[in-house]
């Protein structure tokens, strides 16, 4: 069944000059049929630079929105319309406008995990792979950072010379992990290196041997010569690409770290989206132009 469906998807993709982008947190079978698998930053670049007519974005809504902002001439499809991001929903344009009024000299840096309405009010976006670099490069000593307070506190540690005003948002999957979860895994499986995403809260980050984005974690594990066992403290979907890229090492996920929104997309959704061109992302042009500035600044500052 799955193999037949995959073949039909690949044929539809060819017929429609479409590409399938999948985030590392997607289901393994979805990653298998993707043209490109990556983190938010790399997928944003691909969406902008690729010459396909249609982008099928297997991720969550803010990712598909970002692709449409960067590539308005392309048809952008989100196969599963219920795939939202609770953290992105924690930041609203009205609240951000009020915070900007309280801090008129601050520059606003939004994690790409935000709505297009929030991006329209920001000076630049960032991802977990380039947040510290962008905050360091932006021409202001005062920064409003949203929506993730954990990533923001990590950036504050990396860029102590800046005054960072944190929004009170978080990723539910990463924020729920506590130090005892790490200790239990080490007691069960023995000594191993800990790879943690910066969306984790500080007590967990402090236990990590390496802190980085999903892509950076895979790169680190591939190049590291000091260990062959790793505890991977991020969403479990990363295991598919991590084990493929580094088959000679052992990776232990935290089984509780499952994002139901990232796992909402199934092969059937991708097939139906290609057949019926559903569900297409449309953004009002004035709003798109405002959001475009923050995403383009991210691509420039994040180089």
Curated annotation (Swiss-Prot):
It is an enzyme of class 2 (transferase). Binds 1 [4Fe-4S] cluster per subunit. Transmembrane segments: none annotated. One of its GO terms (biological process) is 'de novo' NAD biosynthetic process from L-aspartate. [4Fe-4S] cluster binds at residues 85, 171, 259. One of its GO terms (cellular component) is cytosol. Gene3D superfamilies: NadA-like (3.40.50.10800). GO terms for molecular function: 4 iron, 4 sulfur cluster binding; metal ion binding; quinolinate synthetase A activity. It comes from the Bacteria. NCBIfam families: nadA, PRK09375.1-2. This is Quinolinate synthase. It comes from Clostridium acetobutylicum (strain ATCC 824 / DSM 792 / JCM 1419 / IAM 19013 / LMG 5710 / NBRC 13948 / NRRL B-527 / VKM B-1787 / 2291 / W).
């Amino acid at each position: 069944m799955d193999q037949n469906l995959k073949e039909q998807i690949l044929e539809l993709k060819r017929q429609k000059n479409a590409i399938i982008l999948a985030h590392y947190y997607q289901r393994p079978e979805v990653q298998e049929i993707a043209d490109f698998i990556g983190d938010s930053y790399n997928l944003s670049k691909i969406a902008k630079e690729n010459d396909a007519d249609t982008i099928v974005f297997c991720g969550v809504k803010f990712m598909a929105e970002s692709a449409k902002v960067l590539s308005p001439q392309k048809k952008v499809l989100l196969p599963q319309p219920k795939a939202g991001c609770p953290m992105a929903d924690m930041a609203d344009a009205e609240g951000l406008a009020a915070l900007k009024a309280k801090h008129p000299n601050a520059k606003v840096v939004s994690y790409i995990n935000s709505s297009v309405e929030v991006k329209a009010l920001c000076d630049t976006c960032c991802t977990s792979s380039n947040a510290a670099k962008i905050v360091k490069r932006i021409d202001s000593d005062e920064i409003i950072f949203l929506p993730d307070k954990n990533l923001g506190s990590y950036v504050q540690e990396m860029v102590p010379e800046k005054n960072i005003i944190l929004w009170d948002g978080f990723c539910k999957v990463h924020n729920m992990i506590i130090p005892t979860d790490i200790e239990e895994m080490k007691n069960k499986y023995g000594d191993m290196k800990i790879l943690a995403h910066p969306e984790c809260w500080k007590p967990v980050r402090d236990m990590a041997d390496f802190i980085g984005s999903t892509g950076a974690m895979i790169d680190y594990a591939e190049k590291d010569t000091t260990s062959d066992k790793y505890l991977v403290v991020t969403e479990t979907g990363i295991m598919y690409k991590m084990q493929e890229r580094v088959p000679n090492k052992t990776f232990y996920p935290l089984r509780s770290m499952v994002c139901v929104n990232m796992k909402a997309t199934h092969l059937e959704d991708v097939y139906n989206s290609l057949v019926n061109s559903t569900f297409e992302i449309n953004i009002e042009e004035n709003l798109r132009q405002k959001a475009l500035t923050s995403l383009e600044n991210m691509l420039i500052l994040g180089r």
